[in-house]
């Protein structure tokens, strides 16, 4: 073996060429830098002067990340790069980003150097995990917040909290809970954790962290908007602008679980017109397809009590009102849509509602095309004005292992929380492709970050009719809207009225309903709905009764 003698001069030369500190540990890219730190690939990407993306992955991990939420691509941004001790510092006109090349920690400051947020040292963790044949990681990212710093967001939660400090929240979409891994700080920044698997958010005195059940990388966006409006602007710049709904959708909506016939639905509109009380929308809930569970969600009128649905819609329109109907993502095994999806292996396998039904694989473009085809030919072409996409979580009543089945987009566990935005977005895009005569209107029970670009109006699910639940809707709606999605509402009066067995005959329930109506007047969609008892205004008393007069007054405020 040949050796070389290394002199002191040679050693000095080697030391000098290594002087650029960590200059060889990172490289510049078109929108930021790349580095290898702590056995991780780390990328810092400027999407704008105010928006920065951080991607970390174990070295050697081969993956392609498709975001269901983010539609923005990096814009040309002026920024500087300098080395400082063990760190590299990137600075735009809005923010300063410091990456520690020893620990992988990323810290954020404004352009003046005022600290905004910092990751924990070694706060990014990947734990290998296998779900059936799919090998992936449990992914964790931890941050350090100021002790008295308030944060908001995380979607529509029912725990009654506005400030999400000192909370542990399981972010998995279910009925009445919409989970968005996004927080906004009173310091004028926000963080969007771009992961769709069930995730646990934890905040305690030691850390603020996102722990996701599946992912190939830690992927999040830091946005600095200086104030709440500025941060929401950044989120919409990143995930899409809000669509303006048609004017009529901002009027009053009447619904119940359910109108049992074509005649009953039309009579409701007629009575509102006779009373001179404003009404813009009427909603047909489930079982217009029939009452046998095998015919569940046939996406067509099959109930003999709705003998002429096209004429029904025409009659609604003649009374200067609009109609939408309930469509679910699950289908009974006797329906044509079930048979077509099943023949092409486009159904997912887990217990849902009802148990005899199966949910379609919304991530598969062929399944989405079939879904819309039935909606279009059986409903939209007959005059339907919009869509009530119910249970878009979708409802999952099975063991945890069923999350490990494959979808078109990969492991279901990896993409679970993205189901609503894909399903809702597909209906929006399909209708736009078919016709520009009507603005798309969608009411839906679940959501994910970015859903505002489809103009969808989310509601808070099947909540109970109590004063405490009404109180909890205020922080639920505010924290949801803070995530960049403005269209939100609740079932006025609460969905489940079994707390009041006598329903509208009980003065106590009527008072709750009236107060809930006053709240609902100032939400983006004013919609009366529920089970157990009807809620039409003319059933609350005669004109002159305080309940009737108050309800009429607040309905008129919408106009």
Provide a role label for each language-model segment.
Residues 26, 30, 45-88, 126-129:
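A low-complexity, Ser/Thr/Gly/Pro-enriched, surface-exposed linker/loop concept
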Residues 31-37, 54, 86-93, 106-109, ...:
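Generic recognition of long tandem-repeat/solenoid scaffolds
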Residues 42-46, 95-100, 191:
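Broad, structure-driven detector of short, well-ordered beta-strand segments within folded domains
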Residues 114-559:
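Catalytic-domain carbohydrate-binding cleft regions of carbohydrate-active enzymes
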């Amino acid at each position: 073996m040949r050796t070389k003698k290394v002199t002191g001069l040679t050693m000095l030369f080697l030391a000098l060429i290594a002087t650029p500190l960590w200059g060889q540990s990172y490289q510049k890219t078109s929108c930021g830098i790349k580095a290898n730190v702590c056995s991780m690939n780390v990328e810092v990407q400027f999407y704008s002067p105010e928006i920065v993306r951080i991607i970390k992955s174990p070295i050697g991990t081969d993956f392609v990340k498709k975001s269901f939420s983010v539609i923005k691509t990096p814009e040309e941004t002026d920024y500087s790069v300098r080395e400082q001790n063990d760190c590299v510092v990137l600075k735009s006109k809005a923010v300063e980003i410091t990456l520690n090349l020893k620990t992988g920690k990323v810290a954020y400051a404004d352009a003046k150097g005022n600290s905004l947020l910092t990751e924990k040292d070694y706060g990014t963790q990947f734990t290998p995990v296998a779900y059936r044949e799919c090998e992936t990681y449990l992914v964790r990212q931890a941050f350090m917040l100021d002790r008295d710093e308030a944060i908001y967001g995380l979607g529509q939660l029912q725990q009654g909290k506005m400030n999400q400090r000192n909370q542990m929240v399981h972010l998995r979409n279910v009925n009445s809970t919409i989970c968005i891994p996004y927080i906004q700080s009173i310091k004028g920044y926000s963080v969007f954790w771009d992961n769709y698997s069930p995730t646990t958010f934890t905040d305690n005195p030691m850390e603020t962290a996102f722990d996701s059940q599946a992912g190939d990388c830690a992927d999040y966006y830091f946005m600095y908007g200086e104030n709440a409006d500025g941060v929401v602007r950044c989120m919409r710049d990143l995930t899409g602008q809000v669509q303006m709904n048609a004017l009529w959708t901002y009027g009053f909506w009447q619904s119940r679980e359910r109108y049992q016939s074509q005649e009953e639905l039309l009579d409701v509109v007629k009575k509102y017109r006779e009373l001179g009380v404003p009404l813009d929308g009427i909603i047909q809930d489930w079982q217009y397809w029939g009452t046998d569970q095998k015919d569940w969600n046939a996406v067509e009128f099959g109930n003999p009590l709705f003998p002429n649905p096209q004429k029904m819609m025409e009659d609604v329109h003649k009374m200067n009102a609009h109609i939408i109907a309930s469509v679910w993502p699950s289908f009974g095994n006797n329906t044509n849509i079930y048979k077509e999806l099943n023949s092409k292996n486009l159904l997912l396998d887990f217990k849902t509602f009802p148990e005899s039904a199966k949910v379609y694989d919304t991530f598969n473009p062929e399944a989405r095309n079939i879904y819309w085809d039935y909606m279009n030919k059986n409903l939209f072409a007959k005059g339907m004005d919009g869509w009530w996409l119910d249970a878009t979580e979708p409802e999952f009543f099975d063991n945890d292992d069923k999350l490990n089945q494959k979808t078109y987009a990969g492991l279901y566990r990896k993409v679970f929380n993205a189901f609503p935005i894909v399903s809702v977005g597909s209906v929006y895009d399909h209708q736009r492709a078919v016709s520009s005569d009507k603005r798309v209107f969608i009411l839906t029970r679940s959501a994910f970050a970015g859903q505002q670009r489809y103009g969808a109006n989310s509601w808070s699910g099947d909540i109970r009719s109590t004063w405490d639940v009404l109180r909890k809707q205020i922080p639920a709606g505010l924290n949801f809207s803070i995530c960049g999605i403005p269209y939100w509402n609740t079932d006025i009066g609460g969905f489940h009225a079994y707390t009041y067995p006598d329903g509208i005959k009980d003065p106590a329930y009527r008072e709750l309903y009236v107060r809930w109506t006053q709240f609902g007047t100032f939400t983006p969609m004013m919609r009366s709905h529920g089970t157990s008892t009807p809620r039409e205004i003319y059933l609350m008393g005669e004109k002159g009764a305080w309940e009737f007069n108050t309800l009429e007054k607040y309905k008129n405020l919408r106009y």
